[in-house]
């Protein structure tokens, strides 16, 4: 060290500089070697490398314990030296020297505080001056800011310069860059009388200002967060009356853990009569009573609601959004059915909803039973009965028994293991014969039957077991007995709707009703509108007609076109060739249904008539849409378009009501007068051509034959709709839509129709519901049709149209087939399964077709994905005649192409409203189908196989009924005029 000081003194003496205070230089080198040498490196004439080597050596060898503390003081060394040399007294310096020896870090902190004291006297005078003129709160704030400023100055002085040194990578040059002349004068012992404003680094002040701003912002955020927490705590506190209700409900629910409760919900309600009933002298109710029920015991009523919800949703439902919506809707239906006051309804539902998702005492008891030691012992004892003990184990356990030696030897030499009774796993492919219906007692003079002593031709229906157990499906044989009943009950006679009709053999049937004479003239105004909008048309060519078809139909009609080029159409081409329709029959709903008959004419006749009708079909549909003022005929639409249009019609009314009505055996009720009205539209569009008139005339008087293996039939019939005619669909749409339009116009109601032939849904306001329902049956009967009005519904999800219901898929409404029916029906096939591979091809084809219709739908998506996963490449099986008339009919005509997608909570809730499957049940069924692996072998059980792994497949869910919105019926004819405003004001001012 001495040599180093001498070297420095000699170096500085060679320069034109005053003498250096060697004692202070030695003390600084001893206490702050690195900082001092860094300053000295800036003196001209001194070797930088030399001082770097010496400083590094000194710090490593003698002052290694001071290196962390010295690094802190490197931030602004020039200011420290100046203040240390000239600002501190000898006493303070000696005190610092003693502290450094004992505790280096404490000494440096003390020195830093002493330095800052030099700059604080001005704060005292400023504080005294401001205190007299400023308010107390402002003076306090300024004092806090000043303290924060100097506190930040103390803490961050070293940090700021350390950062600066690090960024330059030359810490020994920091003094030179900051202040070069001031430290020189200080070490040379010269007094500094003026201060340079540049001595303080601008970065230090900027950083200190940022720290103060950050501190103020932190204080503001602390206050804000504190207020937010207090506000949230206050929001979580119930008002006194609600806290009292909560405690009451909680206490009532806790009573279940103390004893069994037998509640009766009606005992907790008080009836309040708003409007008494009006009854005449004869006892006839002129006006029904209007009453509401108030909840008199909130806790017990809520407990009853919770109990009913748990029974509905099978215990504790999972806490999902879909389940929350379903539970809320169920609780609302219960309260609405009981007539509870709306305010009490909301109060009770809000209190009961959370407790439905919490386990009750009974739920806890169930869980305890399922997991207790007794249960485990019973299960273990049951499992032990299936565990097999090998012959070797028996021999080792008891070698003195000869039977054990025999069994062991048998297992070695014969390899015939001993096992108990085991049932072979049955395959999933089932084959069932067609059904034979009961003979009919109906007779008609124009139906001639000839029976043969032969066995009928037996059809077969195939089933994939394990996919659905709700319903059993069958298939009618094409036999003489089935044909006789189909012709008698679906062509000639209908169910007896008359009370005075006396039948000769079977009183349950009578002839179809005849329309009122001339009734169809009421529809002439609509006919003229259709003809005007469609315009005059001409028949299309053979090539254009053939372009409407493909596959087997194209081949059939191509041959007919060639035949017509050789000889013209004749009356024999209009004769009917009748047979039993091969369709899947729900034998669970109807054990003995009447067979449907198909009555097609010769393809030659269809070609000639089709050239007049095929190209005007959709223009007529559009004309009917114009008459109704919106989309009415839903032919050719996919499931998305139909669902969106139905929801659009429902949204048109504030309180909508949908009334579905099905024309019972529509084709059988089409009379001669109805056919002539329909034909007049076609002839008017084409200008009454002779050939078209002749072709349509042959539809008025029909002659048909039917052949089976065990019989022959010949019959004559006037009128009726023949299911194989070219105008079957078009004619039914025309008749149904115009008859309903006449009903709506005659009643003067605002309504929208959804029509697809004989499937109809009329959407109107709840105010018009009663009027429409009362007039519906009589109005259709005037036209010769029987209709059955279904129960009105009030939400979109419960509208049933073409055996489908709208379900919201997250973006739009989509028509979905009923899963309770289709899970069983789509597992049945009328396409023959010759081999296991043909069954798997059919399964894959059905799965792809179904997924295209129901992608993104609960249960249905998993169902069809299961069929796809278990199937193989479908080949051309989907092009077969049997397949095209099944599930893929909707797909083929609607051109839907949906894909598998995640299922949203809104979709699950909408699916629950439509079909009754709760979200938990949906998830459970999807889990079953996702893990199902089918055994593709033939089943030989002799009975339809069931699915014990998933009992939900055998249960029919209960659809949640939605009550209509409360509204007062519209008074269409006021009995008394309303009072003018002047009289109302007088009435209000009169004393009570």
Swiss-Prot record:
The Gene Ontology terms for molecular function here are:
nucleotide binding; RNA binding; RNA-directed RNA polymerase activity
Single Gene Ontology BP term?
viral RNA genome replication
**The RdRp catalytic domain covers which part of the protein?**
656-772
PROSITE patterns for this protein: RDRP_SSRNA_POS
Region called Disordered, residue ranges: 963-992
List the Gene3D superfamilies hit by this protein, alphabetically: 3.30.70.270
| Keyword terms of this UniProt record | Host membrane, Membrane, Nucleotide-binding, Nucleotidyltransferase, RNA suppression of termination, RNA-directed RNA polymerase, Transferase, Viral RNA replication
InterPro entries in UniProt: DNA/RNA_pol_sf, Rev_trsase/Diguanyl_cyclase, RNA-dir_pol_PSvirus, RNA_pol_HCV
Q: Does the keyword Nucleotide-binding apply?
A: yes
Can you list the GO cellular component terms from the UniProt entry? host cell membrane; membrane
Q: Where is it mainly found?
A: host cell
Does the entry feature the keyword Nucleotidyltransferase, yes or no?
yes
Listed under catalytic activity are: RNA(n) + a ribonucleoside 5'-triphosphate = RNA(n+1) + diphosphate
> Which residue intervals are annotated with compositional bias (Polar residues) in the record?
964-974
The job of this chain, per UniProt, is described as: RNA-dependent RNA polymerase that plays an essential role in the virus replication.
Q: Which family does it belong to?
A: Belongs to the tombusviridae RNA polymerase family.
Name of the protein described by the UniProt record: RNA-directed RNA polymerase
User: What species is this protein from?
Assistant: Panicum mosaic virus (strain United States/Kansas 109S)
């Amino acid at each position: 060290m001495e040599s180093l000081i001498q070297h420095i003194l000699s170096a500085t003496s060679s320069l034109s500089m005053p003498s250096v205070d060697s004692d202070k230089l030695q003390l600084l080198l001893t206490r702050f070697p690195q900082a001092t040498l860094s300053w000295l490196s800036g003196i001209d004439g001194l070797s930088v490398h030399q001082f770097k080597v010496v400083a590094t050596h000194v710090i490593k060898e003698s002052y290694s314990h001071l290196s962390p503390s010295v690094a802190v003081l490197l931030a602004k060394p020039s200011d420290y030296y100046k203040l240390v040399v000239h600002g501190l007294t000898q006493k303070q310096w000696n005190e610092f020297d003693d502290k450094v020896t004992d505790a280096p870090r404490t000494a440096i902190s003390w020195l830093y505080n002493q330095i800052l004291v030099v700059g604080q006297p001005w704060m005292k005078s400023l504080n005294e001056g401001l205190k007299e003129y400023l308010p107390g709160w402002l003076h306090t704030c300024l004092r806090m800011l000043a303290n924060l400023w100097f506190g930040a100055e103390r803490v961050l002085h070293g940090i700021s310069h350390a950062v600066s040194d690090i960024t330059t990578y030359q810490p020994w040059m920091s003094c030179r860059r900051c202040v070069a002349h001031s430290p020189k004068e200080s070490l040379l012992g010269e007094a500094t009388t003026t201060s340079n404003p540049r001595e303080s680094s601008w970065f230090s002040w900027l950083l200190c200002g940022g720290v103060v701003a950050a501190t103020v912002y932190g204080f503001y955020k602390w206050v804000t967060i504190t207020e937010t927490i207090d506000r949230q705590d206050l929001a979580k506190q119930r008002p006194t009356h609600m806290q009292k209700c909560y405690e009451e409900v909680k206490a009532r629910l806790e009573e279940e853990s103390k004893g069994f409760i037998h509640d009766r919900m009606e005992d907790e309600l008080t009836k309040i009569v708003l409007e008494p009933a009006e009854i005449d002298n004869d006892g006839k109710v002129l006006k029904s009573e209007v009453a509401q029920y108030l909840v008199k015991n909130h806790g017990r009523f809520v407990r009853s609601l919770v109990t009913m919800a748990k029974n509905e949703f099978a215990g504790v439902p999972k806490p999902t959004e879909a389940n929350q919506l379903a539970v809320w809707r169920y609780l609302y239906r219960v309260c609405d059915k009981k007539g509870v006051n709306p305010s009490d309804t909301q109060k009770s539902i809000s209190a009961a909803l959370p407790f439905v998702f919490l386990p009750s005492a009974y739920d806890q008891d169930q869980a305890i039973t399922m997991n207790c030691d007794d249960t485990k012992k019973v299960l273990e004892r049951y499992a032990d009965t299936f565990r097999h003990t090998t012959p070797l184990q028996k021999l080792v356990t008891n070698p003195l028994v000869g039977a054990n030696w025999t069994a062991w030897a048998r297992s070695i030499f014969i390899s015939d293991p001993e096992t108990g009774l085991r049932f072979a796993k049955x395959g999933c492919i089932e084959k069932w014969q067609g059904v034979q219906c009961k003979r009919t007692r109906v007779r008609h003079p124009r139906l001639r039957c000839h029976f043969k002593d032969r066995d009928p031709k037996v059809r077969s229906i195939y089933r994939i077991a394990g996919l659905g157990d709700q319903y059993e499906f069958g298939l009618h044989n094409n036999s003489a007995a089935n044909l006789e009943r189909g012709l008698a009950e679906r062509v000639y006679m209908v169910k007896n709707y008359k009370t005075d009709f006396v039948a000769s053999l079977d009183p349950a049937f009578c002839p179809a009703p005849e329309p009122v004479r001339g009734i169809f003239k009421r529809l002439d105004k609509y006919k003229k509108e259709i003809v005007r909008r469609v315009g005059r048309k001409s028949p299309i060519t053979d090539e254009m007609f053939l372009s409407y078809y493909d596959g087997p139909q194209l081949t059939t009609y191509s041959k007919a076109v060639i035949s017509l080029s050789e000889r013209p159409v004749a009356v024999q081409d209009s004769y009917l060739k009748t047979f039993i329709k091969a369709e899947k029959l729900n034998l669970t709903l109807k054990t003995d249904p009447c067979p449907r008959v198909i009555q097609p004419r010769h393809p030659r006749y269809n070609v000639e008539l089709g050239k007049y009708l095929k190209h005007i079909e959709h223009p007529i549909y559009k004309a009917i849409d114009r008459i109704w003022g919106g989309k009415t005929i839903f032919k050719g639409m996919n499931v998305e378009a139909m669902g969106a249009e139905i929801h659009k019609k429902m949204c048109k009314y504030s309180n909508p009501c949908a009334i579905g009505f099905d024309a019972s055996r529509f084709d059988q009720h089409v009379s001669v007068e109805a056919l002539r009205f329909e034909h007049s539209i076609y002839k008017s569009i084409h200008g009454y051509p002779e050939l078209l008139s002749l072709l349509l005339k042959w539809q008025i008087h029909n002659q048909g034959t039917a052949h089976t293996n065990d019989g022959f039939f010949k019959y004559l019939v006037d009128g009726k709709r023949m299911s194989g005619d070219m105008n079957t669909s078009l004619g039914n749409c025309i008749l149904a839509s115009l008859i309903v339009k006449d009903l709506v116009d005659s009643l003067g109601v605002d309504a929208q129709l959804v029509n697809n032939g004989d499937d109809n849904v009329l959407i109107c306001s709840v105010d018009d519901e009663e009027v429409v329902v009362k007039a519906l049956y009589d109005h259709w009967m005037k036209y010769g049709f029987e209709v059955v009005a279904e129960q009105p519904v009030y939400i979109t999800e419960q509208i049933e149209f073409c055996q489908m219901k709208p379900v919201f898929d997250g973006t739009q409404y989509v028509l979905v087939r009923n899963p309770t029916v289709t899970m069983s029906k789509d597992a049945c096939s009328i396409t023959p399964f010759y081999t296991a591979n043909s069954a798997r091809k059919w399964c894959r084809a059905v799965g792809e077709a179904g997924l295209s219709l129901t992608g993104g739908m609960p249960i249905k998506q998993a169902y069809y994905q299961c069929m796809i996963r278990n199937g193989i490449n479908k080949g051309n099986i989907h092009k077969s005649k049997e397949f095209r008339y099944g599930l893929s009919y909707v797909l083929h005509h609607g051109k839907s192409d949906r894909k598998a997608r995640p299922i949203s909570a809104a979709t699950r809730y909408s699916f629950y409203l439509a079909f009754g499957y709760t979200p938990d049940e949906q998830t459970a069924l999807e889990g079953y189908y996702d893990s199902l692996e089918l055994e593709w072998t033939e089943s030989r059980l002799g009975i339809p196989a069931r699915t014990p792994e998933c009992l939900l497949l055998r249960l029919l869910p209960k659809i949640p009924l939605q009550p209509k919105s409360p509204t007062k019926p519209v008074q269409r004819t006021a009995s008394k005029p309303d009072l003018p405003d002047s009289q109302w004001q007088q009435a209000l001012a009169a004393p009570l």
